[in-house]
């Protein structure tokens, strides 16, 4: 909106949302780096972004100094949502930025104790015969936005820590699990296969759902953003899906690209877009093509300091 007021996502979710704030800041820091050495108007924009970045109080979301970050805080309900964020899921970028903040930064222990759960985030296992190294919250292998949202700016290539020897390899394998599950197609949905895979959070046949590669959370809905935003991990397989979807363009393609989701089984082709799904397609295609957004975000000195921390 144009008022700056919060639009409640739910009754008690009517205040600060640190995860979504982190996604916003990730993008803004890339924009900052693009304009910081430009003309006077561009430099002024970069300065405004820098002020927003410095104003985010990451430390507040430790709820009294705990070594974990909480997702929500409400001016009317306080901490009643009570959602401490542990890994692994889409929220890694929140912990990276919280460590990187020059004004309201958190100590490294918040990452190690909260996100990594003192090492419990490490849980080597196989899904669809493919090796995964991390523990995925509530599931053996999560939806594909878990491999994408934190890495729109944060470059997974060469990124590692004591819990994961290669975040790029881990996210690639998470993507391959999703593809392999869709090819196996245990619920026998129409259309699923090597050229039509990709389960993630999107519009769904019954509203909105975080579709995942398991029989409980697979509703037969393909979300184009899932495979297309995976192009940095699986370029050939993602292009295979893109070509197939384009051959179905009368049903799944519109003025702003591929629609958010569809189900051949249910003959469900809603001509709707969802910005948080559309955005990663463009960003990840450009990262695959040139690495532009990765280079911009990773060049920010605060980000580098946070990663070293």
Regions found by a protein language model. Name each.
Residues 1-309:
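Ser/Thr/Asn(+Pro)-rich, low-complexity disordered segments
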